Amino acid sequence: MNKNSISLKFKHLYEMFKPTILSVAIFFSCGEKPQNTTFDITKHIECSLEDCIEEYAIYPLKSDIPINQIEFGMAFDSLSFYKSSNSKEIYYFVNNEYISKLASIGRGPGEYMNINNYTYNPYNNTIVISSENEKFHIYSLPDMNLVRTVNRDGFVKGMYPLSDSTILTVNHCDEKFQNGYGIYIVNVNNGHRTLIEEIPYINSFWFSGNEFTQTDSSILIPVSGCPNRIIEYKNNKISDLATITFNNNNIPKEIYAKEISTIDEKMNFTNFFLENDYKIGCFYPIITNSLTTLWHTPKINNQYQFMMLAYNNSSYINFSFHIPGINRRIIPDYVADGYYVLIIQEPIDYLIDTSESLSKLGKEIIDTMKKQNNNNPILLYFKIKPSILNEK
């Protein structure tokens, strides 16, 4: 794998709020009539990650200074960016070498603001940040100097660059429905936004960071809501590639609804899922001609299971992965160039599972971590085998 070929991709994993799907109906559009298949989440297998990937690579993030706990990663060619877990900093790397850091946004101590999310804009080499005070902050690279601050409307849950002055966003929309969301094109020079797709209901915990995924010719937007959708933005148009809806198994009839149409339905639906600790959605879809994969965390027997659903027109399996000898749940932190990416930053003593022997991959991970200055993070890139369903 050539790291320099990595296209602009975005992370979207939040550790606490992940989807639960007891069984779902999913409709994939493949140029012909969409197919309707019911997926049973209990149909899953556990296996070693090494048995299910066709290639992988490990990259240490190189820095002479300590890197705080990071999340919300993204990559563009040789450039990569990470937000600190405390939502205060953004780190900038080239070829995995530390270049600079945005230490804070705001006027000074006591007035620093949290970074809700951000995107790199390759068209003008800037970072666009959405802060907690309903503003866009644009910073130049590599010096991280403030270029301008622009007022914005609504809470922004995700951003993706379209040109030097416009970005694609998912953000709060009150035009037609209370507390709804929409997909917008926003001008970051003046904050003006144009609604291109309404989303009447989405999970309030969805899109804590960027989940957009870029293909060769389009942008994929996974929407966790009712229904869940994988939306494609291509040639200035929006279309659904997949629609994922719940079956009503284990969900009371008065709660279950394929389409949320009223505020009362929305509140009942939301309250039920919160009170029963259910989560909904789909994350990190990668769609090819032969295979679709996406991730979810169903709650089975009162325990969260971290799973990847692999699907084609004839079969499907839910996979739970592990790396022998490594104490680390396997669910990606972002997608880059068709690869899933894990940010590994746990202490080595915690990572090593003494109950089993280290696999070849596990040994490479530990050896790389031991060489890191300041216990800084490393990245594990991996690509799922296209034939994974045929081998299980």
Q: What are the residue ranges of the model-derived segments?
A:
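Blade-loop segments of beta-propeller domains
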Residues: Y98-N124, S131
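A short helix->beta-strand "capping" segment at the edge of beta-propeller domains
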Residues: I41-I67
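Asp-box/WD-like beta-propeller blade repeats and closely related beta-sheet repeat scaffolds
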Residues: E134-S163, T169-E175, L195-Y201
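Short loop/turn segments that connect beta-strands within beta-propeller blades
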Residues: F93-E97, S140-M144, N187-G191, Y233-N236, ...
